[in-house]
């Protein structure tokens, strides 16, 4: 949103793949960029903020989870309020990120990134989840009433120009100030520094979501087949109610959000050194 349109801005996006392959692709891409630059008498700067006053660079870690048959568990479908499997997976992700927001922050920490995070070019240094108006409304219904009877539909963008047709607007919308944003059928973790491997943040996301899945599976298996549907419903409502503090659809750059995040009890680490303590907590030791 802010300062995003700048001269000679370029982005390079490898094709989505499985975690280990995508991590290798990202490393090879960085090496290739440096080698090709030298070949043309240039230097590829992967530092997050090489020059003061000039926008730095980072990378978006696009994360989703699929079954062995190729089913994307983060695909909400046309009516996400009726998609119980999606809502359960979403609830587990919300729980995971809220429980281990400090570890996510640490996974994207380095000295160069400290100069970028929180500026108007990058997401804030405070981890929060952006779901978009459609899913935010579904979560609100579940928390307030225990069920979601409806979901918002995408609206239409009226251009006002006779030669340009009206365009359908995505119901999930976008928020460039969010560090962990839902974008249609995946999450984008936007805090990662341009010089870093995506191995650490992706492994962290995998680990914290796996823990949430394990806890949910234990609860649902203990409920038995007869009470399974009710147990799923109750678990979704419980997770979303207990961890809704991590959800934020507003301006992540604002000073008001920093104060609000502190009021909610979210971890606020100004820099890399501060975030290291996240690795020594009891919950982190149990996780790893």
Where are these regions (language model features)?
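A generic structural motif
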Residues: 16-22, 69-71, 78-80, 193-198
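Generic structural "secondary-structure junction" signal
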Residues: 14, 75-76, 182
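Short, hydrophobic beta-strand segments
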Residues: 10-19, 63, 190-193
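Short, small-residue-biased leader/transition segments that mark boundaries at the very start
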Residues: 2-6
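Catalytic or ion-translocation cores adjacent to nucleophile or general acid/base/metal-coordination motifs
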Residues: 1, 25-48, 53-55, 64-112
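Acidic, glycine-enriched catalytic cores built around paired aspartates
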Residues: 7-10, 27, 50-51, 57, ...
């Amino acid at each position: 949103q802010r300062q995003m349109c700048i001269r000679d801005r370029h982005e390079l996006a490898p094709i989505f793949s499985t975690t280990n392959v995508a991590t290798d692709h990202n490393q090879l891409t960085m090496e290739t960029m440096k080698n090709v630059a030298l070949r043309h008498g240039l230097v590829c700067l992967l530092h997050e903020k090489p020059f003061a006053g000039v926008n730095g660079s980072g990378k978006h870690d696009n994360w989703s989870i699929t079954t062995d048959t190729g089913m994307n568990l983060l695909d909400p479908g046309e009516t996400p309020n009726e998609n119980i499997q999606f809502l359960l997976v979403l609830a587990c992700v919300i729980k995971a990120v809220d429980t281990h927001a400090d570890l996510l922050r640490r996974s994207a920490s380095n000295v160069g990134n400290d100069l970028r995070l929180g500026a108007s070019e990058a997401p804030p240094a405070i981890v929060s989840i952006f779901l978009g108006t459609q899913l935010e409304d579904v979560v609100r219904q579940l928390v307030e009433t225990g069920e979601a009877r409806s979901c918002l539909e995408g609206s239409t963008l009226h251009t006002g120009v006779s030669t340009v047709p009206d365009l359908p607007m995505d119901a999930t919308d976008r928020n460039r100030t969010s560090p962990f944003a839902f974008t249609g059928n995946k999450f984008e973790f936007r805090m990662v520094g341009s010089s870093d491997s995506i191995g650490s943040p992706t492994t962290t996301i995998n680990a914290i979501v796996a823990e949430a899945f394990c806890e949910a599976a234990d609860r649902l298996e203990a409920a038995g087949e007869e009470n399974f549907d009710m147990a799923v419903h109750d678990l979704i409502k419980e997770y979303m109610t207990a961890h809704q503090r991590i959800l934020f659809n507003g301006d992540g750059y604002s000073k008001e959000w920093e104060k609000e995040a502190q009021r909610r009890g979210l971890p606020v680490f100004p820099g890399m050194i501060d975030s290291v303590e996240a690795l020594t907590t009891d919950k982190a030791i149990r996780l790893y």
